[in-house]
Amino acid sequence: MNLEKINELTAQDMAGVNATILEQLNSDVQLINQLGYYIVSGGGKRIRPMIAVLAARAVGYQGSAHVTIAALIEFIHTATLLHDDVVDESDMRRGKATANAAFGNAASVLVGDFIYTRAFQMMTQLGSLKILEVMSEAVNVIAEGEVLQLMNVNDPDITEENYMRVIYSKTARLFEAAAQCSGILAGCTPEEEKG
């Protein structure tokens, strides 16, 4: 199955994900709205939330909470991008000025924090301690991955094992969490959740 077919299959759910993202970004603080909209409208394929949607379909989930899972997965990813661009001193992402280049480092870090905490508010609204546990652990692993990358940034002797640990921590763990949370929603066994 190609990406075009997957986009067709998930279009309705992904429209809901995008609407949820915009709704949940809303704040009384104007800078949060401006920077938040700037970063979420900057392109990207939304593959992580799409994994949550596809996993929910694969296990026969019939509810709508997978849309919330998918949106909060994208929020976690977005917050990591905001922080990562500050740490890496990046000024371009996807052919556009990074949020830190456009709004400053402090604003990017603080709005990243807002997006992280909003994701956790969304998790608690789902009422699943198991989802909260999975996502808390995943975010912790992501943070560890960021620190590992920082420690190895100028190390030409980094081992393949350490490099793969950074990749797993910064990227793969959130993909896993997206699929696992959809399995939890569907009432899968622990083995099925991770399978």
Name the predicted role of every residue range.
Residues 1-22:
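N-terminal amphipathic/basic leader segments beginning at the initiator methionine
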Residues 15-16, 22-195:
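Mg2+-dependent prenyl diphosphate-binding active-site environment of isoprenoid biosynthetic enzymes
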